[in-house]
Amino acid sequence: MNFKVIFAAASLLATQAFAIAGIGFHYSPNVGTTLKTGKQAPLKVNDQVYPVEFSHGDFDYIQGFGFKAWIDILPFVDVEGTFNIQFASYNATLWADGEPHRLEIELGGTPFAKATPKFIAMNADISVTKPFSIPLFPIRPYVGAGLTIYWNTFILNNAFVEGVLERSGKDLSGSSAKEIADALAKNVVDAAKDKGLNKSVGFHLLAGARFKLPIIPIAAYANVKVYLGGEYDSDIDAGHVAFELGGGFAL
């Protein structure tokens, strides 16, 4: 009896344990992407120094989530498509007579409401991978590469605020520091709403594995991706390495 059970289990594992297609959801942190602190400094336009200062905070990493769909039925290669959203928060402050005026920004084109400024990076990947088989184990490792389309937001920095100040400078002449800060805060928020997403194209390399037991229509997967190319705001130090850890439904 024990021999029959062992034989049946081995036969089951030896059968095709991988889906012809699947869709999943995953956690996706990006390693090494950082923003350095923008130190408090006076705002200056055309050699005119205003009695208002600006500063912004920093972050050490970004994290997020994503979705993936894949096809395993093709001969020799698999194909997968991924969409990731990663983000981090930082503060931005106008200073008037030593008093902080915190800025809350609604970044157009992103699924986030008005809040402290956020850096948001989105990417869509299409990948072609070469799978490998491990006999008697329901694991499908693979390596591959593909095309990436990037979208990301700008950083609310000194240059952006000075640009807004330059466009509204005449209306603020003769005002007190507090009046300038109050008016400038509103103008910055309005300008940020109209600021679109940066878009660029690049490539990526990936290595990963999918795990799926026979018959059960559930799969788990893990990927590591190295991104090549892509354009970011000059204040962003992009890490170019992301992980995907998740699972989903597979047929």
Regions from the language model: what does each represent?
Residues 10-12, 16, 110-111, 115, ...:
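Short stretches within intrinsically disordered, low-complexity N-terminal or propeptide regions
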Residues 59-65, 118-124, 139, 199-203, ...:
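Residues that define the transmembrane beta-barrel architecture of outer-membrane proteins
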Residues 129-237, 249-251:
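Outer-membrane beta-barrel transmembrane domain signature
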Residues 27-31, 68-170, 216, 251:
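Gram-negative (and chloroplast) outer-membrane scaffold detector with strong preference
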Residues 18-72:
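Short glycine/proline- and aromatic-enriched beta-strand/turn motifs that initiate or cap beta-hairpins
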Residues 1-21:
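Cleavable N-terminal export/targeting peptides
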Residues 22-24, 239-251:
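Outer-membrane beta-barrel "beta-signal"
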Residues 49-56, 108-117, 189-195, 229-235:
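Extracellular loop and loop/strand-boundary signature of outer-membrane beta-barrel proteins
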